[in-house]
Each structure stands twice: as C-alpha cells, then as structure tokens.
Curated annotation (Swiss-Prot):
InterPro entries (UniProt xref): C-type_cytochrome_biogenesis, CcmH/CycL/Ccl2/NrfF_N, CcmH/CycL/NrfF/Ccl2_sf
Sequence similarity: Belongs to the CcmH/CycL/Ccl2/NrfF family.
Gene Ontology CC annotations of this record: plasma membrane
Compartments where found: Membrane
UniProt GO MF annotations: metal ion binding
Statement: the UniProt record of this protein carries the keyword Metal-binding: yes
Name the UniProt record assigns to this protein: Cytochrome c-type biogenesis protein CcmH
Signal peptide: 1-20
Positions that bind heme: 45, 48
Gene that specifies this protein: ccmH
Function of the molecule: Required for the biogenesis of c-type cytochromes. Possible subunit of a heme lyase.
Organism: Rhizobium meliloti (strain 1021) (Ensifer meliloti)
C-alpha cells in the first residue's frame, strides 16, 4: 500500500508543472501555443523569481502568459514579445540573460579577481623569499641587547 501511495505521489509530482497554464489561456492554433509556451519558459516570474511564467501559478505570471499570447495573436515575433516584456520589467525578467558587455563583466569578474589574487600571492611570496638577511650583530650590539633584555 505504501509503495502504491509513493508511486502515485511521484506520478502527480512529475506532472504538477503542467498545470500552471490554465485551459482558458491555451491558444486555438497549436503553432502559436507552442511559440507562447517557448517564450513563457524563457521569462522569469517576478513573484516566484526562480520559476518561469510557464511554471508559475502566480497572478502576475498568468497576466504575463496572457500578454505573451495576445502579442503573438497580434502578429509579433518571438523576439518582439520578449523585447516588449524586457522593456517593461528589465533584464531580470529573462531566465537566461542576453550576452552583453555588462553580463560579461558580471560573469568574468570572479575569474579576473581570482587571477589577480593568485598574481598578488606569487609576487608577495617572491618578495618575501628575496629579502637579504641582516648583517650579524657586533659584540657591542650583542652586549647592549643583553642589557636591554635583562630584567
């Protein structure tokens, strides 16, 4: 019985993301619906933040799904729909940000800082090893040091 319940739970959990898009949102044209689903999978839900609007049940995600479908019905291209949503919500709405100079800096900065840190450590280690040992103390300096260190 427990195995049956576990199997049923796993089956229901595996199809749960398919329920995010309500039947009243589905377009009659299968090609447009496929494009709408593909676009919705690329856009982040601003409420859930780690889900696409295709997977989210939030009201904002529903509104965005309807907006995507409406724009597609009006003849917009996929890129035009995505650009429209980005213009209203910013780059953060994209689950996979576009490759631009600022994203290259964001992704490249950790590697640059790592290389700079390694170079700094190597230079510091070489400088430390290159120090010339001091000259030995003279008898007078040893005597003075002994006097200073005695209680």
């Amino acid at each position: 019985m427990i195995r049956l319940l576990i199997a049923l739970f796993l089956l229901l959990a595996s199809v749960a993301p398919g329920f995010a898009v309500n039947p009243d949102e589905v377009l009659a044209d299968p090609a447009l619906e496929a494009r709408a689903r593909a676009i919705s999978a690329q856009l982040r839900c601003m409420v859930c933040q780690n889900q696409s609007i295709d997977d989210s049940n939030a009201e904002l995600a529903k509104d965005l799904r309807l907006l995507v479908r409406e724009r597609l019905k009006n003849g917009d291209s996929d890129e035009a729909v995505i650009s429209y949503v980005v213009s209203r919500y910013g780059e953060f709405v994209l689950l996979n940000p576009r490759l631009e100079a600022k994203t290259l800096v964001l992704w490249g900065m950790p590697a640059i800082l790592l290389v700079a840190g390694i170079i700094t450590l190597v230079v510091a280690a070489r400088r430390r090893g290159a120090r010339v040992p001091g000259a030995p103390l003279s008898d007078e300096e040893k005597e003075r040091l002994d006097r200073l260190l005695r209680p």
